[in-house]
Amino acid sequence: CLNRVVAQDVLSKYNNPAGDNAAFDGYAIDSKDTNNLKKDKGRLFRIIGIVAAGDKPNKKKKQKFQTIEIMTGGLLPKGFDTIIPIEKINFYPNKKNPKFILIKEKIKKNDHVRFKGSDYRKNDLIIKKGTIIESNHILALKTLGIEKIKVKKIPNILFFSTGNEISN
């Protein structure tokens, strides 16, 4: 369908991403738990699980000073509002078998979070009628799971000249 003309507007059928999710591998926390932290005295946050992309997050109520490991694309569980990238994590007692992470400073809300519908909102215009389809349109269609769209029929054109008035 590359280089074909779109016959009708193509709209997003749903939000993409479908929910707030992690932009990086890391640990999700509630930023409010870091409000009173000072650099000289950190706070341990208990690791309570892991969320991978495609997992449905646990709906169990989060306790104060808890964290959950989260993979890129993993949906943010209820009660968590920010992601600390894995590269910035201090593990306790050690990296090989961590039970806690150590946080030594205030963390801003919504860091490294991709919000529901931040790429496409439900009913967003993806491709306008009359547009010639390019490769970036195909990426958007694939991202949204749209496999078929209506395109205009390729016209059959025949050129034929008569006479010698168009020659030298």
Could you say what each language-model-derived stretch is?
Residues C1-E147:
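Phosphate-interaction motifs
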